[in-house]
Amino acid sequence: SDIAIIIISIALMLFLGFLMTRITKKLRLPNVTAYIVTGILIGPYVLNLIPQKIIDGTAFLSDIALAFIAFSTGEFFRFSTIKKNGPKVVIITLLEALLASILVFVVMYFILHLNLAFSIVLASLAAATAPASTVMTIRQTGAKGDFVDTLLQVVALDDVVGLIAYSIAISVAMVSSSGTSSNFMDVVKNIGFNVLSLALGCGFGFVLKWLMPKKRSTDNRLIVSLSIIFLFCGICAVLDTSPLLGCMSMGTIYINITNDDKLFKQLNYFSPPILLLFFVRSGLNFDLGSLTNGSEAVGTTPLL
């Protein structure tokens, strides 16, 4: 039955992802590597153990996993820390994001001669850093200190820059590919949705604080926090925008008005299976054919 297929598929993704970490641990590789490799191996291009309808039906995991990661990074944006490291973090973020984007655009457009629209979008994507893999690797190694705090702040701000850059780039690329005149309102609308997400996240941070009195039991704290994060993800899905910025601002507001780091620790205990499924699913979606076959990539240039 369909129910049996769903349950067995999720069980396989979880257990095989765990087994692969036993191998990567011997090689001193992060668990994220194990999860992605597992997804590739059990995916449609190798063993084909997971039906395509399961892969398509778990698309929501991406938003939920990113929401957990973004909320947890908010813990590192205490106002006292921002005052101390703010200028340094901003300079590092802008330099690495802008230089990466410029380099990718030069290579894609002037060297590989890909079309302008695709080159612009790829350049904007180069500005972003994957927060999930960074946070999971830090958790796995137990790393702490000023460097880790600065790294997480840079990764978080980097995604702010990346999302804004992508919002602009995708609008410019659509205009370029369609040959129509530039519509400034499309750019403003995309940026506006991200700003709205930030504002809503701040509001949800205050709501979360109001719903978390000190007498609230541990179980109910977890239930309430999950319901708020899931609700916010749903609103972002309706607005067709990423929950990343909003959940980041939610976590930032919550930690600064409550100084309650216990909630973040609770969510850290709950999130590993979701993050494992997210990365395994990323591997399942990986198109091995596009690495060497130019006809499956954009233009005629293979990804490899």
What are the functions of these language-model segments?
Residues 5-20, 78-109, 116, 182-204, ...:
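Entry/N-cap segments of selected transmembrane alpha helices
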Residues 35-38, 47, 66-70, 100-108, ...:
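Alpha-helical transmembrane segments and their lipid-water interface positions
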Residues 10-11, 18-19, 157-163, 167-273:
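Core mid-bundle transmembrane helix pairs that form the ion/substrate translocation pathway
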Residues 36-43, 59-85, 170, 174, ...:
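Hydrophobic transmembrane alpha-helices of secondary-active transporters
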Residues 66, 73-77, 99-104, 125-166:
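Short helical (or helix-break) motifs at transmembrane helix termini and adjacent helical loops
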Residues 24-31, 49-60, 75-92, 114-116, ...:
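Interfacial helix-loop-helix linkers and transmembrane-helix boundary segments
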Residues 1-12, 54-70, 116-130, 189-200, ...:
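Structural signature of hydrophobic alpha-helical transmembrane segments
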Residues 48-49, 103-106, 162-171, 231-243, ...:
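Hydrophobic alpha-helical transmembrane segments in multi-pass integral membrane proteins
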